[in-house]
Amino acid sequence: MQTCQFTGCDALELVDMDSDYILGQVVSRQMILILISGTEMKILLKIHFNDSEGNSLRRKKFPDQPTDAQLVTAKTVDYMKELTNQVSGRICRIFQLNNLSLGMCIPLNMHGFYELYTDYTAEDGMLKKFGQAWKIKGDFGSLVCTAYVEIMEPAAVTHLQYTEEQKTDDDELEFL
């Protein structure tokens, strides 16, 4: 999984959500959200994390960072924003390979309780909407990821195919 090189983790595991989980449920103290959109579709991607998990994940990639509590929190949020940005960029590249041009906004940090205000109601009319949640586990703990997808032009996404991208040396996580 290419995400391992962004996180510094040896192995990441995709695990099922708890059986009592409901989309829109608050699962962590913080979340980073980013909007990926184009004329055909929109994806609202969120990575939910607690400070301890985010900090543990950040320290795997950058072990020599300072330990001042306020600075650690800021660095952790910055790291999680960049991780969300990298994942979203990867999603945009996959859609670009399928001739769908999507752009993305700047990642936004919010408190996890704002998840309560998200409407994950599925619709199957002219505008197709659905939500999905998954959990990624590693030696840092776990992250919950949620996505809410709105498809405005269903015909444009019926041909989508995913092929694994070739690994290159320049896929390293960069903080600008």
Tell what function each PLM region has.
Residues M1-L176:
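Composition-driven recognition of glycine/serine/threonine/acidic- and proline-rich low-complexity segments
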